[in-house]
Amino acid sequence: MDFKDLIKQRRSIRTFTSEPVTPEEERALLRAALMAPSSKGKHSYFFKVVRDREQLAALSQCRDAGTQLLADAAMAIVVMADPSITDIWVEDCASATSYILLQAEDLGLGACWVQVHSRGKEDGRSAQEIVKDVLSIPADYQVLSMVAIGHKAVPRNPQNEDKLLWDHVL
């Protein structure tokens, strides 16, 4: 698939089959993430693969809404950074997250970005602290996102180019 078709086909997928993601697919996803651009080539990003069902279920509760899809995903990739490497860690992690999403589509997998940074629960707990606790992530790391990944349970139509917001181009 060429790039134009890839970005048109890529959609957020929130329902998955029970089919596992293969080790080869996982490696391709991580390879793409590790090739993402980073500020001054410092690569402040780090990744954690989560396949454990109990951990995925716990991660699905890190916010009050919008995270339940993690419980049914075959896996998730947590995208985080060591902010002591660069103050541009958010941008580095966002690039890596986007590369994971595009690679997933290229592999025929479904994926959805789950925002962690600056999100939380109504009781005041931050999503980031919950994720760090579940996965024993170092306290000084910052978690930007998680990507829920699996085989698509329901296909989605490609992006409709007629709905592009060209008036947003100034």
Each model region followed by its residue ranges:
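Acidic, surface-exposed loops and disordered segments
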Residues: 1-170
